[in-house]
């Protein structure tokens, strides 16, 4: 079982049941100073967070990862070069690379390719798997054919996909991503934070549900969904 709370832009607060039956709390791309965020970094002071995953080093994804790691004691998981830089900030950082399965405490993860840019290490997406649910956060990415392979190999139940265009996939490209990944649930992200990434999540929902078997849930910042 998974509980996913949308924190605006590309940030999520996720609870997964671990392989040992214990819940693990995970933050994904935690830019909590985004203009849509319902929470502030200070709201996490003293909270239990196990892992913070960062898909790449752009400020709207790396966000408040260091501050949150210091406040919660969470380990930051990122591509190797970025993790090395973060460790210099005094946080516990786990470095990995694309395609290398990670066995973490109670959960598994693997970084996936992403078509984007990044100054420190390659841009990535990430699949995080608990006892009975796998969540794919695509990071910032354009559409690419190996999303089909991600679907076949890692079978994500939930896909968190950017739809805002300009820097990432737009609605049409994200629809094709759903066709390739074949998740049971898709949640749009990375839209309407700035004028450049205006998009209609309801149009995405309409297209996906009309042409695939995937359900789309459009979350407002602060809302959450439970899966299954």
UniProtKB/Swiss-Prot annotation:
Keywords: Hydrolase. The keyword Transport does not apply. The keyword NADP does not apply. Coiled coil: none annotated. Pfam families: Lactamase_B_2. One of its GO terms (molecular function) is hydrolase activity. HAMAP family: UPF0173. PANTHER family: UPF0173 METAL-DEPENDENT HYDROLASE MJ1163 (PTHR43546:SF3), UPF0173 METAL-DEPENDENT HYDROLASE MJ1163-RELATED (PTHR43546). Belongs to the UPF0173 family. This is UPF0173 metal-dependent hydrolase Tpen_1493. It comes from Thermofilum pendens (strain DSM 2475 / Hrk 5).
